[in-house]
Each structure stands twice: as C-alpha cells, then as structure tokens.
Amino acid sequence: MTTTRRATIEDLYETAGKAEIVNGELVLREPTGDEPGFAGDEIFASLREHAKRTKSGRAVGDNKGFRVHLPNRDSFSPDAAFYVGPRAGMKFFEGAPQFAVEVRSENDYGENAEKRLAQKRADYFCCGDAGSLGRGSPRSQSDQVLPVK
C-alpha cells in the first residue's frame, strides 16, 4: 500500500524545474515558449530598473520560490516579481512578493484556467501581495502533479 504525505518546502528544494505546493501537492510547471518567456523577461527588466532607480526592493525573475503559509498553498513561483523582504541566501524568499506576475502560456486559456488564476490571485493577496498581474494560470493543462511519498 502506498501512502502519500503533504509536500514540504524541502521537497521543492529536491525537485528539478519549476514547481509549487498547492493543496499539499507538488505541482510541476512546464517550461514556456518564446512569447510568454519574452514577456516575463521584459517585465523583470522593468522591475529591475524600478528597483535600481528607487533603491528599494528587488526584481525577481522566473524560477524563484516564495515560501508562504496558507491553508491551501505553501509556495509561489511567479514569472516575475518585486520583493521587499530580507535576502534569503540559497533558500526560498520568505513571504509573498510585493508584486507578482504570472504570464499566460499556450494552454492557459478557458474557463478552468480563469478560475485557477482567480484563486491564485486571491492567494497572493491573502499573503500580503500589494498587486498581482494575472496574465497566466497557476496550473495549465500541461502541468503535472506529483505524489510525494
């Protein structure tokens, strides 16, 4: 008999690629294509310029983890973000970013994607995120949920 347990941040550290913990499950996200990747990069570059100009916060690019403490979510990994908290060294950032961006990929359209996006936006705001540009889906049709054993 196989039993599964709730995924932990430590599981994320051992997972290759981009992943988040949602409802206790480790959710892997597929790499994105040219256009959504370029859009995320451009937003990161704008946030980086803002951080340099204002000497406040940090622009955070894709594939970085933010550790949060919600009943249904333990982490975020936005496509771009602005963070004002302490440096985290080799670990995930603690808490949600001040501003987060999710860029919509090819499979991130339709009614179910809109519902997931609305839930992820609500999760960001519950964690203290001051703004979220929801141009993507927290889980597209191509994402994979892994059981944690």
Residue ranges of model-derived segments:
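Gly/Pro/Ser/Thr-rich low-complexity, intrinsically disordered segments predominantly at protein N-termini
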Residues: 1-149
